[in-house]
Amino acid sequence: MKKMFVALCMAVALAGLSSCKTAQSAASTLEALDGEWKITTVEGQAITPKPGEAEAIIGFNVKEKRVYGNSGCNRLTSALQADAKKGTFTFGAAASTRMMCPDMDTEQKVLTAMGKVTGYEITKDGKLVFKAEDGKAVMTLEKK
């Protein structure tokens, strides 16, 4: 009986420790988002600033649970809505400036793609990939 009790206690302790590791790795994944990321592709097409456009970026402040960035013309900000454990991510209602730029092509592509994002993955080579509900890459970003 005593051996069974000790074995049960060890099993409970081991289960508790493994859940701590999961929580830590989830937090680590979210922390990996922290900072600014340059948008390199949208829907498989390379994104390069055209004359009059700013560099398209998305930044994360994980501590403040905030997303900010520039979609090529306008600045934007939103709440960070992510679950690192599940790899889910959505952009909340975003506030944006309303400037008109000579070419709004990048702006349109970025904002349309942002509306499709439901998940994310950080690849082995350090790229951030936003994914749509079907699992396909919507945007690829590189850490600045």
Predicted regions located by residue number:
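Positively charged n-region of N-terminal signal peptides that target proteins for export
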Residues: M1-M4
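Lipid interaction determinants
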Residues: C9, L17-K144
